[in-house]
Each structure stands twice: as structure tokens, then as C-alpha cells.
Amino acid sequence: MLKITNLSAQVENKEILHLISFDFQSGKNYCILGKNGSGKSSLAMLITGNPKYEITDGTIELDGQVLNEMSPDERARAGIFLTFQNIPEIPGVKLFEFLKSIYDAKAETPSTFLSFKKIIEPLMQELEIPKDFLWRDLNVGFSGGEKRKIEVLQIKLLNPKYIILDEIDSGLDVNAVRQVAELLETTNTPDNSFIIITHLFEMLQNLPLEQVLVLEKGVIKQV
């Protein structure tokens, strides 16, 4: 369970969340709604450990383990995954290198070139991602839909416990939104949970939701 208790936080001495409490149950999906500036993305940043965001009160726990002082990498290894609103392009880093590095960070022993190739290529085939993408610079020249497919590929590869989708529909046309939603459905299992931050209900049609939270000015107004 991802448990948030009396969480307050600030950025540059400005309060952004005030006494937020909620339990995200394992294996269930949730949606967070709210206007721009309501605190939706701030909550995602706090869960994943973005150092720009300062917790002033309360705790974030994952399966009984307090995350407050853990680094973003430690939280990722514990099972937290975040998609980005604006996916960065990283020239000089091949997709294969990036995927292997994040896989090895969670593995007990590092994979070899050939062993990882055998792991990643079937997953790419499932998502209809061309194999030659592995040897391209990370996200450079990729369309919005292709970048989102790479994020779905990471979810399949890492099997995180809690997957936070922060405006994953950003920059996508209607057809691409529908396609990404269908791909996400294939990654949703009884062992993981999606926390979806979105304005578009198309993203919600393929995933069964347990609850919808409404944030307003850093406070939960409706559940």
C-alpha cells in the first residue's frame, strides 16, 4: 500500500499541499483530477522524491517503509514509476543503453548484452516498437506517440508497484491517446496500481478505477 498521511509540502517557501491523507491500495487504480495549480503534479513529484519539493509535515510510506528521506533512485527501486508530461530527448545515449541501465539498477546482478537483448526485444514486439529504435538516441526524433510507447515499454520491463501517469496524454492527438490507453491496459495487473493525473477521460476508459480524487488549492476536496 502507498500511504500518505497528513502530508504538507512547499516549493520556495510557498505551500503547495496541505494535510493530504489517502491510502492507495495495491492492485487498484486511481485518478486525480483538478485544475492547473491544484497540486496534482506536485503530489506526484513528492511521491517520487523530486528534490525541488520540500515535505514540511506528514509521511509517505510504501508497504510500511517511510519514503520521506529516500532518493528518487531508491524510490524507483522500491517500485515507484513516474511518466513525464514533457519527455526529454537525450542525444548521445542510446535507447538500449538507457533501458539496460534502469533494468540493471533493479536486478540482483547486471545483465549481459545478449541476455538483455533477449529480454527487451520480445517486449518491443508486443508493443510494435521497431527493433532499430534500440540503437537510436533516447527519444531524439521520436513522435509523441513513440515516446509514450517507450514509457509503456519501461513499465513492462520494470514491473513497478505504483505507476504515476502525469498528464500522459500531453501532446498526443485523439488516436494516439486511444492507442496509449489500450497499451497501458496490457500492463495493468493485480500486482500493480495506476495513479492517473489527466484531463481526458479517454485515458480512463480502459482501466478500472477504484476512486477519483479531486484536488483544489492543495487540499483533497472530494473522493
Question: Predicted segments — roles?
Answer:
Residues 208-223:
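H-loop (His-switch) and adjacent beta-strand-loop-beta switch element
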